[in-house]
Amino acid sequence: MKKRLFFTIAAMFTVTLSALAQYDDEYEIIVTDANGQRQEIDIPEAMTFEVDSMLNQYYSKTFLADDENCTTSSSDPEFTDQEYIDRLSRLPYVVPMPYNEIVRKFIDRYTKSGRRTVGYMIAAMNLYTPIFEQALETFGVPLELKYLPVVESGLNPSAVSHAGAAGLWQFMITSGKRYGLRVNSLVDDRRDPIKSSYAAAELLSDLYRIFGDWHLALAAYNCGPDNVNRAIHRAGGSKDYWTIYPYLPRETRGYVPAFIAANYVMNYYCEHKICPMRSTLPEKADTVMVDRDVSFKTISDYCGIPVEQLRALNPQYRRDVVNGSSEPSA
């Protein structure tokens, strides 16, 4: 297959989510367990990114704007636990969406301090959805897992974690290569929204085949199958996520609750008076096949497309060069 250059594709936002929160409580949530003990749960890294960093990037400033016909309220309406339970139970999902204090804390993170971030991510999610759903459907993975990149990367294809995971789905180099993603000096397919989505769907399918439970598969996606197996062993062989929960790595304990919260907020943002941002990105993609090296500068000069826009739409190319000649294929 010849190399592909995506000139315009609505789904490909590139924002650098680099600014982190200022205080310790921005990195963790505190709950009380069944024994009355204080429990500190790490917040996924993408949930600590500042919305101002997102909105100051080239693509956000060029193609996103607040909707003049809808204003996000400054405060979040209050709801009872039963209302949250009822809403989660109405979602037409295969993956269980239980409600508890931990899930509620993560919902509050999105609907209270993260209101502007949610408005941004809804706009981005509307555009990424076709890519995610097609990849998940190909491997028989429940479509609700399309919201996993909300937790993983904040929907930033160029996001890089402190551990070196990259892209929308936050692949490490080793796992990315195992699932066919090229990582070299010129190309990082972990940042390619399409290729990484298919790789993630295949990985999730494999993890479900191992554990037979979507919560455990999600935990393994975050911390690896070995850590989940160790937690199962320490929990006496139980394969219930909430039973093995205390034995999982600290950073993984908040992962499934954050995923449930992301599914909730992406479906019920209106009830919380959160307005999506308005996107002026084109709805169609134009693909050009190349079989030789072409620089972004050459493409920009020929097509009149700013280099910054080419970078934003093609985050997988690391040196502003589409390397069509390095790995020619049919």
Can you annotate each of these PLM segments?
Residues 1-26:
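Bacterial Sec-dependent N-terminal signal peptides
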Residues 20-139:
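An acidic, Gly/Ser/Thr/Pro-rich helix-cap/linker signature
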Residues 102-105, 120, 124-127, 131, ...:
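Extracytoplasmic/secreted proteins, especially bacterial periplasmic and envelope-associated proteins
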Residues 106-120, 154-162, 170-212, 232-246, ...:
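Substrate-binding clefts and substrate-entry loops adjacent to catalytic sites
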Residues 141-159, 217-224, 310-314:
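Short, functionally critical alpha-helical segments immediately adjacent to catalytic or ligand/cofactor-binding
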Residues 248, 313-330:
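Extracellular LysM carbohydrate-binding repeats and other cell-envelope/extracellular binding modules
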Residues 250-271, 327-329:
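Catalytic cores of secreted or luminal carbohydrate-active enzymes
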Residues 277-304:
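Primarily a LysM-type cell-wall glycan-binding module
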